[in-house]
Regions:
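ABC transporter nucleotide-binding domains
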Residues: 1-130
Length: 130
């Protein structure tokens, strides 16, 4: 992984077993061999038609789903152990497509972004958040 990359995903695969009968199943390839890198300061948007795997990529990237195969790197470190995942989740988040279920209109943007920072005690003083 390049040190310049904040996030790097290599050959990510996420397959789900779909029951095709009482005792049979077949794999559904929801994400198949996806690779990308995000440098510090960059923004990435996942765009595609409904059902193409955008949400699955996001959930797998956050380890909400265990990847079938592939590697996820964050700040030069491969995310693989339970401790890695816990530390990684403190520093990452997913914003879902529906802003009404993702963002509370009664909260300021600062409060929305600051809430997880408060929960994880990621700053000593509120002024550090800005």
């Amino acid at each position: 992984m390049s040190v310049e990359n904040l996030v790097e995903v290599k050959n990510l695969k996420e397959y789900f077993n779909i029951n095709t009968g009482v005792f049979t199943s077949k794999p559904l390839k929801a994400v198949d061999d996806v690779s990308f890198a995000i440098r510090k300061g960059e923004t990435l948007g996942l765009v595609g038609e409904s059902g193409c795997g955008k949400t699955t990529v996001g959930r797998t990237l956050l380890h909400l789903y265990k990847p079938t195969a592939g590697e996820i790197w964050f700040q030069g470190k491969k995310i693989e152990t339970k401790q890695d995942i816990l530390e990684y989740r403190k520093k990452t988040a997913m914003v879902f497509q529906d802003p009404y279920s993702s963002l509370n209109p009664r909260m300021t943007v600062s409060d929305i972004i600051g809430e997880p920072l408060d929960v994880h005690k990621m700053y000593a003083d509120k002024s550090e958040m800005v």
